[in-house]
Amino acid sequence: LIYKKVNTKLVEQYVEYAHNNDIGCLRLCPCPGPKLPWKHMPKTFGVLNKNDDYYISLQTAIWDKETLLYLLVPKQNIWHFESDINAKRAHNIKKPFISVWREEDLPPGGPIKYIITAITRGVWEQVAIDLLVKENIPINGIKND
């Protein structure tokens, strides 16, 4: 659930940067975020470490098509995609994975501000309910009083 206006111009700049610099994945939501600066643009991006949890993530990102297709496995669900097994497959990828830095203590940073997890195990998170109520968006099973 997006809660602020998307900075489209910045997204377009990041797409161009990723394309021109042969980036495997440019994460637009630093969740988890990088720990080390990206050598080419250290104030804008950090490099993701292949050994970190959720190195492979389905958070908002700009993917190199071949990189993403290599990581997709038929009949695999989203939890498998983010698993350690798939992260090990990513060790074969030579293209770097980078991420925007967090702009504040809590994610997300970057050009798209959104609620990272709106539903957990079939239950709406309170932060998501609050946003839907604020925006007057009805959802099944929840009253918007």
Language-model-detected regions and their locations in the chain:
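Short catalytic/ligand-binding loop motif for oxyanion handling, primarily in non-cytosolic enzymes
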Residues: 2-5, 34-38, 106-115
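Membrane-proximal basic amphipathic "stem/tether" segments
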Residues: 133-145
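Conserved donor-nucleotide/metal-binding helix-loop-beta segment in metal-dependent transferases, i.e.
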Residues: 2-35
